[in-house]
């Protein structure tokens, strides 16, 4: 595996600011939440195009299993510029990210059968949450 380029926050922010036509909030949010990072906070994507390429690469890997699956470039064109497909936040950060373990879901529903407002009910809900987030 070839080493990835590590960017500073300022490098990614400036490149993203240009990508988002000067929208400071969009650039800050993208770098802070969605740019590929390792568990030490090192940034490996300069702009959302890098993220879209990562997503397209991973989705194309799955598509290759099907007779008429889409190619990486076809998927990238749908994602590029947030024009046709805009993934939710957790998938944008997590798909193709082999540096951190994270959820690809933005929402979980935890059951509330019985008496949820009791020690036993609270412990059962905690146990369900641990099971949802456990990684081995």
Annotate each predicted stretch with a short phrase.
Residues 1-136:
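Extended catalytic cores of very large enzyme megasubunits
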């Amino acid at each position: 595996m070839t080493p990835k380029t590590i960017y500073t926050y300022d490098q990614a922010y400036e490149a993203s600011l240009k990508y988002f036509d000067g929208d400071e909030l969009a650039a800050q949010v993208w770098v802070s939440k969605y740019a590929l990072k390792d568990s030490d906070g090192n940034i490996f994507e300069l702009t959302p195009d890098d993220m879209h390429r990562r997503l397209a690469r991973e989705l194309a890997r799955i598509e290759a299993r099907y007779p008429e699956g889409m190619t990486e470039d076809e998927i990238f064109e749908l994602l590029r510029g947030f024009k046709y497909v805009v993934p939710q936040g957790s998938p944008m950060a997590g798909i193709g990210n082999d540096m951190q373990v994270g959820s690809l879901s933005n929402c979980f529903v935890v059951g509330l059968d019985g008496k949820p407002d009791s020690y036993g009910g609270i412990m059962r809900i905690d146990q369900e949450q641990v099971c949802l987030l456990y990684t081995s």
